[in-house]
């Protein structure tokens, strides 16, 4: 006995409606996948549940490419069918709004998928594509990280080399200044030693060997006579006394 015909009307029971939606959605996604393989067709499917949850399927690797292709085709077709410029402008604005809104929703959905959220409605092929995209992103991230680490390492090595050269230069300058200070200190010590050396004793001379100046001779009853520069120095006093004939003392022979 075959299955009876289902009446096409809204299911009032929420649980039955949710169960029917899940079954029909899975069948719809399966049919879309089959027709894309059997007929080599480019198929994209977008479904929103009564709660606003998005479910999609795309035979291509990226849904954005399919949407952009659809927008270009739809825009070109409407351009030919709308001769009125005013209507054409309104149509363009409506299309632009719809395009941007769909793109925002798609970006938000992809962001949730990249964070590991709302993965229940994704097929195996979409999960594989998501995994491939994440692997590619991780490769780019690791490559960029390694590049930055290599550049940072090179910068640190150059900085280390500059610091070592600067330290070597400072060490050389310090040694030169220490050498100059030691030289000045040695010179100062030598000068101090030369100033503090005891004077050597002078040889003592025999007083009898010293030639004295001839003392001026005294002449009693006469005038003071100085030294004759041509006369020979004498070391004794020459006194000349005249004979005294006075005071009844007799006379003294000269």
UniProtKB/Swiss-Prot annotation:
GO terms for molecular function: DNA-binding transcription factor activity; protein dimerization activity; RNA polymerase II transcription regulatory region sequence-specific DNA binding. InterPro entries: MADS-box/MEF2_TF, MEF2-like_N, TF_Kbox, TF_MADSbox, TF_MADSbox_sf. Residues 182-191 have a biased composition (Polar residues). Its main location: nucleus. SMART domains: MADS (SM00432). Residues 90-180 form the K-box domain. PROSITE patterns: K_BOX, MADS_BOX_1, MADS_BOX_2. It is found in: Nucleus. It holds the Pfam family K-box. The keyword Cytoplasm does not apply. Residues 1-61 form the MADS-box domain. Residues 182-205 are annotated as: Disordered. Keywords: Activator, Coiled coil, Developmental protein, Differentiation, DNA-binding, Flowering, Nucleus, Transcription, Transcription regulation. Homodimer capable of binding to CArG-box sequences. CAULIFLOWER may contribute to the shape of the floral meristem. This trait has likely been selected by early farmers during the domestication of modified inflorescence structures. This is Transcription factor CAULIFLOWER. It comes from Brassica rapa subsp. pekinensis (Chinese cabbage). The lineage of its organism: Eukaryota, Viridiplantae, Streptophyta, Embryophyta, Tracheophyta.
């Amino acid at each position: 006995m075959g299955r009876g015909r289902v009446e096409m009307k809204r299911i009032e029971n929420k649980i039955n409606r949710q169960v029917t939606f899940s079954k029909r959605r899975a069948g719809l996604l399966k049919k879309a996948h089959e027709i894309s393989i059997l007929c080599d067709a480019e198929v994209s499917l977008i479904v929103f549940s009564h709660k606003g949850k998005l479910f999609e399927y795309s035979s291509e690797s990226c849904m954005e490419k399919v949407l952009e292709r659809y927008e270009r085709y739809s825009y070109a077709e409407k351009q030919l069918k709308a001769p009125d410029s005013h209507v054409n402008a309104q149509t363009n604005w409506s299309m632009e709004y719809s395009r941007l809104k769909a793109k925002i929703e798609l970006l938000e959905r992809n962001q949730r998928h990249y964070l590991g959220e709302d993965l229940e409605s994704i097929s195996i092929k979409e999960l594989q594509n998501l995994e491939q995209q994440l692997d590619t992103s991780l490769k780019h991230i690791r490559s960029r990280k390694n590049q930055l680490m290599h550049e940072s390492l090179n910068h640190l090595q150059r900085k280390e080399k500059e610091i070592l050269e600067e330290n070597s230069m400072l060490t050389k300058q310090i040694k030169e200044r220490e050498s100059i200070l030691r030289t000045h200190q040695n010179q100062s010590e030598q000068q101090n030693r030369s100033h503090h050396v005891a004077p050597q004793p002078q040889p003592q001379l025999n007083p009898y060997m010293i030639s004295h100046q001839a003392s001026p001779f005294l002449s009693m009853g006469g005038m003071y006579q100085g030294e004759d520069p041509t006369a020979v120095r004498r070391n004794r006093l020459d006194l000349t006394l005249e004979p005294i004939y006075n005071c009844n003392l007799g006379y003294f022979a000269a």
